[in-house]
């Protein structure tokens, strides 16, 4: 395919540009502007390469001429004592003629050295002419070329071989360039190693860093210890609606100001647990104390936990805050307690706190939140056994009676079943919303 010029490329259609790119081995599925740019770049590159090849061929031809002249001068000096010389073009070797092979037509005898010199001049002129304008070789020219120097053809390659030679000569040059550009890794590593600090320097630097860090921490802690706000803690009675454990913790956090990282971490963990408890057990918090009358009166004591515990997920240290801790504060009213100290006391581990002593009289004097059962209780064990036996017998009788007449569901049974399904569905949705039940994938 003929490669068009740069001016012709602008006038070509997009489809023609694509076909041209495909034929040249370039990417064709580009936008028109990018494709045109790529083709122009390729054509320029090819033209530059062609010019370089021409320059190389000219330089190689001139070098070949020089070598020819040198070789011819050497051969003249060598062949003056010899009587005759033969040269076969195909084998490219000087052959000493035997008496048997003298009958062949390929040998030419030269007696005088002057004739030999004239022959060589003519040959060199013919070679230059053929190098510039290639023409079909005749038999007469072949005969003339046969009487050339001995090793000239072997040393000087033909036109076909010249391009190969030039390409090969250019390759080692490229290799040399790459060898120069490759970095000396040994030197690089040595320089990098020298830049690195020694172990002693590293330890000194670390010590300085730690000393600076400790001094900064000391400076931060000094204003906290000195400038604590000396305010008496107000006596807390029964918990109001607004004073939930979460709100207490928030107020403590506000009054604290900048506290140490360890206490902050503990506070964060407590906060998380309190939030999770608030999500899971909303009815058992102190905030819903006013809704006691709305509940059913037949509640068991196991469920009633508003007075004893604050929240399900909080540690025992939090539960103690409401009752026993207030007594200690009122007893030691002379001792000043800053908000910072208060938080540390509140965030003690449940292991360090002692269990609260159960007061029987106080618990009995408290009014019941439910109506106790009046009258006789049913016997627990017997009723259980009898129920099981009765159910078993009834089931057998039922199957005996109705194995030929299948039991049809009544509308009431269907309604009850639907209601039960709705209740289960509602409970499941509420559980998922509160994070009690994991959502099914």
Swiss-Prot record:
- GO MF, any single term: RNA binding
Localization, per the record, is: Cytoplasm; Nucleus, Nucleolus; Cytoplasm, Cytoskeleton, Spindle; Chromosome
Phosphothreonine carried by residues: 182, 244, 314, 338, 349
Q: Where is the composition biased (Polar residues)?
A: 56-74, 100-116, 241-264
Entry-linked Pfam families: NUSAP (PF16006)
Q: Does the keyword Coiled coil apply?
A: yes
Where in this protein would one find the motif KEN box, according to its record?
Answer: 384-390
Q: What UniProt keywords apply to this chain's record, in alphabetical order?
A: Acetylation, Cell cycle, Cell division, Chromosome, Coiled coil, Cytoplasm, Cytoskeleton, DNA-binding, Microtubule, Mitosis, Nucleus, Phosphoprotein, Ubl conjugation
GO-annotated cellular components: chromosome; cytoplasm; microtubule; mitotic spindle; nucleolus
Any idea which residues bear N6-acetyllysine here? 411
Q: Where is this region: Interaction with microtubules?
A: 237-382
Question: Family per UniProt?
Answer: Belongs to the NUSAP family.
Q: What is known of its domains?
A: The KEN box is required for the FZR1-dependent degradation of this protein subsequent to ubiquitination.
State what this protein does: Microtubule-associated protein with the capacity to bundle and stabilize microtubules. May associate with chromosomes and promote the organization of mitotic spindle microtubules around them.
Give the quaternary structure.
Answer: Interacts with DNA and microtubules. Microtubule bundling is inhibited by IPO7, KPNA2 and KPNB1 while association with DNA is also inhibited by IPO7 and KPNA2.
Which PANTHER family does the annotation name? Answer: NUCLEOLAR AND SPINDLE-ASSOCIATED PROTEIN 1
* Name recorded for this polypeptide: Nucleolar and spindle-associated protein 1
